[in-house]
Amino acid sequence: MKLIAGPASKELGERIARLLNVKTAPIFFKTFPDGESYVRFDVESLKDEDVVIVQTTSPPQDQRLIQLLLMADNASDMKAKSITAVVPYFAYARQDKRFLTGEAFSVKTVVKLLENCGVSRIITVNAHNPEVLNTFKISIEDLSAVALLAEYFKNEGLVENPLSLSLGKKALSMATEANSILKGGFDYISTRRDAITGDVALEEKKLAVRNRDVIIFDDIISSGGTMAKAVEFSKERGARKVYAACVHPLLMGDSQKKIMEHGAEGIIGTDSVFSPVSKVSIAPLISKALAKKEQKSG
């Protein structure tokens, strides 16, 4: 196995390599003054190698996606036997269908680009809609980091018998998965999204949060608006401590400040995206999936 740590996931790639007891392949990146990306593998050949490229595609997602495509196509040109793209945060996954007539089916386009660049397998983490990934021909494995987040809360002693909440009923599986470790019960905060503006409103729903510690789980925190509303919603109903937990802490703009000002005790995320709140590493999760595949092919 040859592991290539892309510029967006250098630290994560190196952590995965250490767990797998492999070295990362030397690689050189630069950005030209006009913004174009340059990639060079400092190896003579990748012939007959199983290549793993680790590159998250968080903002600036277009640049990071292009870098990923350049790396994959380059590995293909250098005769790699197989190419696995580890894309912890999968850009454009939220555009998982045509909500309005004439819209691009963005996630399908991204998957096609990766396929055309020689990628035979994709590993991602808590994709926004994992069901849509199963409709593509290419092998896509969606891992869940929720248990790692729950274990962090349990081991750090940040909360006592917490209620695990998801943002929206569709994401209830996140709360149930967390509750399998935290054991304090689970529920969801009811949400409604405007198809045109994308704005999310919270709907009135009874929640047993009074005098309880609460952890609100979501796959992504981007602008932080919905999470801030959810934290405030819980605090107004008597929750004692409220934590925000997410797999992909994009934390655009003043989102972190916004969530804290609405009453959060703290924000905990993973290193799928490097951020000030990335306290939990997904390296063990990914290395386990890669090792399992290696054993099967071996």
Task: Label the predicted regions.
Residues 1-298:
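PRPP-associated nucleotide enzymes
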